[in-house]
Amino acid sequence: PAETEEVRFGGTVREFWDNGHLHIVNEDATVVQAVPCDMEIAGYGTEHVNVLRLWDARSTQPVDMSLFSRGEYLKAAEDEAMAETIAKVLYPEDNHLEGKSLRLKQQYFFVSATLQSIAAKHTELYGTMKNFHEKNVIQINDTHPALVIPELMRILIDDAGMDWDEAWDITTRSVAYTNHTCLLYTSPSPRD
């Protein structure tokens, strides 16, 4: 699909200066394609429809046929299986390192794909990210999507070419947070 986003994991970061501007390049990263799966949700008692965007994860690497032809079937499809695992089962047990790593990858994958999609649509409409905070509000209601803050900073600095202060100003004016677990009705009551 045309709106597929690329989410990058790992790799190395290279910095270079050009005409007084710092540029950041992520090299040798593992790239996972985020494929949008849009579901139309009809409003109650109205003719309006909203779109709920979900994401599927796919590998950018094809099955390694040289490994496959040598009988190493699982190794040949390893990249594909790992990419698909990101979106297959959410929130695995995190009482071991593998579960913690997968949860973090899932959180970053969904945040990055969604923010890249929002930024692309915004840039298509307005031609700039400088007014992002005037047209968008991103509400995070839990700790899982908190990665939206550093990812928006990355997009504004690395992709849109802003300096830190401008990117931080736009980010703080674009992101809102409500921690429901601190609200009174979610707290246990003391016993008499």
Q: PLM features: what roles do these ranges have?
A:
Residues 121-133, 156-169, 177, 181:
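Secondary-structure transition/capping motifs at alpha-helix termini
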Residues 112-116, 151-159:
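Alpha-helical support elements that line or immediately flank enzyme active sites
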Residues 46-137, 147:
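Function-dense linear segments that define catalytic or interfacial modules
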Residues 51-53, 135-138, 164-169, 173:
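Beta-sheet entry/capping signal
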Residues 139-151, 174-178:
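Core structural elements
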Residues 2-49:
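Extended, Lys/Arg-enriched charged tracts that mediate electrostatic binding to polyanionic substrates
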Residues 1-9, 14-17, 45, 60, ...:
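Conserved internal helical-beta-strand scaffold that buttresses enzyme catalytic cores
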